[in-house]
From Swiss-Prot:
The gene is ACTI. Inhibits trypsin and alpha-chymotrypsin stoichiometrically at the molar ratio of 1:1 and 2:1 respectively. This is Trypsin inhibitor. Belongs to the protease inhibitor I3 (leguminous Kunitz-type inhibitor) family. SMART domains: STI.
Length: 176
């Protein structure tokens, strides 16, 4: 079964979407923040305010297929033009999971790389959840991505199995 956005339209391979919490009142969309000693925002977080949609993420998979379904390994990346100057020199900002902290960060890349992604979108209740599959292994090893609040009150996106962030997808560029 294909994945649908908030309008009920099919998620498109290579489309840009705001990733928003399915439940209102629990923060806004996914964006970037500086955490720890980062001089540039590299950590994927949930916006504090539910009125903030966050940054559009391009969701894609290398096979040239138009429609995304729950079985595909996916890449999520933010576009440099939407970001602070320290990130604008990069052509692409794909998500990755830091091994030790299990946090989702961006890995700035000078040029496009067609790597098979490590993430999947899975149906969850009436919405979706994001999961991380280490080393593109079988579904059994995929773990939920959820929110962990740090000492600076950042709502970090982390591998948090059993406590997923329920999400929905809103087109970043609505026509009409």
């Amino acid at each position: 079964k294909e994945l649908l956005d908030a309008d009920g339209d099919i998620l498109r391979n290579g489309g840009a979407y705001y990733i928003l919490p399915a439940l209102r009142g629990k923060g806004g969309g996914l964006t970037l923040a500086k955490t720890g000693d980062e001089s540039c925002p590299l950590t994927v977080v949930q916006a504090q305010s539910e009125t903030k949609r966050g940054l559009p993420a391009v969701i894609w998979t290398p096979p040239k297929i138009a429609i995304l379904t729950p079985g595909f390994y996916l890449n999520f990346e933010f576009q440099p033009r939407d970001l602070p100057a320290c990130l604008q020199k990069y052509s692409t900002l794909p998500w990755k999971v830091e091994g030790e902290s299990q946090e989702v960060k961006i890995a700035p890349k000078e040029k496009e790389q067609f790597l098979v992604g490590s993430f999947k979108i899975k149906p969850y209740r009436d919405d979706y959840k994001l999961v991380y599959c280490e080393g593109n292994s079988d579904d059994e090893s995929c773990k939920d991505l959820g929110i962990s609040i740090d000492d600076e009150n950042n709502r970090r996106l982390v591998v948090k199995d059993g406590h997923p962030l329920a999400v929905r997808f809103e087109k970043a560029h609505r026509s009409g």
